[in-house]
Structure formats: structure tokens, C-alpha cells
């Protein structure tokens, strides 16, 4: 059984752009857009990669301190019947996965984020927010 809901897994596979956050050696947060990630069912983790990935700051940060967060989000256009008078014409949805991370070089450079906290919004329903801690004992190895 995955730490992600079926709806969260489906959403992870549809995103076009995400952001990965890491912490630099001086403690400064670093956030960068990424376009290549996937759920790794063998580890129930999120694998992130990209061009020349082992030469990126995010890769070096994870190699040094073993922590990362990925956020995948977007806006969903509302049907005119769903809109409140004077309200927004779209609503946010997304998922944030925080956790321990590995900087992997073989078979290709990537960051593997092992979830410790998952927060999703607007995925299961327009108004539902799902935030939970994930115990290390639930990770697949």
C-alpha cells in the first residue's frame, strides 16, 4: 500500500512543472523548477531528474544534507456555474512532499525523495486539504 492516495498518484503523473526546495550549506533555502519527476513504486518515493542533474545545486544540497521538498501544483479553471459572484475563475490544487532525500548517481543522476510529510489540496475534491505525517516504517525498501 502506498503512502499516497490514488488521486495523489494520478495527479503526480499529470503535472508539467514542479519546484524542488533544498537547503544550501550556509542554511539558505534554494528552490528551482523541474520538469522531470515520477513516483517510484519500489521505494514509494518521488524521483526527480533532469539535464546534467548531478551538476545542479539541488543535487549537491541533497548529497550534503539529505533533505528535499517537491511541490507540484496548478490552477483548475472553474465552470461558470461553480463561480461565486465576483469570485475567482480558477482554484488551486497541488501536492507537497517533504522528506529524507538521496542523491543517486547510477543508473542516472537523480534525487529520490522519501516522504515524511505529504500535503495535498484540491486533488480529492475542490475544498479538501489532506495533510499527514508518514512514518519511516511505512516506506518500502
Language-model features, listed with the residues they occupy:
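A short mixed-secondary-structure module that forms the rim of ligand-binding clefts
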Residues: 36-78
Amino acid at each position: 500500500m502506498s503512502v499516497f492516495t490514488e488521486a495523489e498518484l494520478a495527479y503526480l503523473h499529470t503535472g508539467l512543472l514542479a519546484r524542488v526546495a533544498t537547503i544550501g550549506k550556509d542554511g539558505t533555502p534554494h528552490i528551482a523548477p523541474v520538469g522531470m519527476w515520477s513516483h517510484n513504486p519500489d521505494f514509494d518515493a518521488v524521483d526527480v531528474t533532469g539535464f546534467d542533474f548531478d551538476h545542479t545545486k539541488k543535487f549537491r544540497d541533497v548529497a550534503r544534507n539529505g533533505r528535499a521538498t517537491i511541490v507540484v501544483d496548478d490552477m483548475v479553471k472553474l465552470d461558470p456555474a461553480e463561480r461565486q459572484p465576483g469570485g475567482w475563475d480558477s482554484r488551486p490544487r497541488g501536492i507537497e512532499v517533504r522528506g529524507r532525500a538521496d542523491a543517486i548517481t547510477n543508473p542516472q543522476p537523480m534525487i529520490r525523495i522519501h516522504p515524511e510529510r505529504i500535503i495535498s489540496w484540491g486533488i480529492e475534491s475542490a475544498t479538501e486539504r489532506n495533510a499527514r505525517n508518514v512514518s519511516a516504517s511505512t516506506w518500502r525498501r
